[in-house]
Amino acid sequence: MTKHDHGLKEKVEGTIDKVKGEVKEVVGKVTDNKKLQAEGKWDKVKGTAKDTVGNVKEKVHEYKEHKKEK
């Protein structure tokens, strides 16, 4: 992705981390593996954070574009 992705990279990475975390958490529960469950929860938190960063970058870009139009 380019430097002009306006948060898309973070959103994609965030979604991947959230899905990966969900899978780890479910597998951890099924196998009674507390460590894997914790890793899954952590991955979901990281994914949410990355997604938020992506959203902020997108909003900043939109704001800058709006200011250019004026």
UniProtKB/Swiss-Prot annotation:
Disulfides per UniProt: none
Coiled coil segments of this chain: none
Top-level taxonomic group: Bacteria
SUPFAM superfamilies, A to Z: Hypothetical protein YjbJ
Protein family according to the UniProt entry: Belongs to the UPF0337 (CsbD) family.
Protein name: UPF0337 protein BC_3635
Lineage start: Bacteria, Bacillati, Bacillota, Bacilli, Bacillales
